[in-house]
Amino acid sequence: MKRALLITLLLAACTSGPPPPAALDTKNESCAWCRMAISEARFAGQVVATSEEPRFFDDIGCLAHFLAGKARTAGTVAYVADHRTRTWVRADAAVYTEVAALATPMGSHLIAHADAASRDADPDAKGGRPRTAADVFGSGSAPGDGQ
């Protein structure tokens, strides 16, 4: 019985797809890039990799700096928080807006949303300039699972 359970768990771990986002504790996490405390989840990002601790970021700009020039490896996924709902969204699939009038933790002025409907429902995104993942993260874009 124990052996069957162990085999099932191992198979599930191998075939479960990209790693899911980790829970963010804004009372205890600091940015992996600038080392500032992460106080506002709506601006946060993270990188999760198989067999590694998640890395959190206080601003999408910090996430972009961290990823610049890094090789995209299998089992690594970047996530950003939907600014309106605070749910995690794959960074390579998010809709970005640059809002010059909006103060973000490190001044990138970038916010992310799961889709255009979430962006359109967010008053903070009004008047902002649409951006793509390639605009934010460069031609390699944000890592998806192995991308």
Task: State what each model feature region is.
Residues 20-27:
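Short, flexible, mixed-charge glycine/proline-rich loop motifs
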Residues 27-65, 69:
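Post-signal-peptide N-terminal segment of Sec-exported extracytoplasmic proteins
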Residues 15-17:
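Bacterial signal peptide processing site
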Residues 56-89:
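Mature extracytoplasmic domains of secretory-pathway proteins
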Residues 76-147:
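Thiol/selenol-based redox catalytic cores and closely related redox-interacting motifs
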Residues 10-13:
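C-terminal motif of bacterial Sec signal peptides marking the signal peptidase cleavage site
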Residues 2-8:
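Sec-dependent signal peptide recognition
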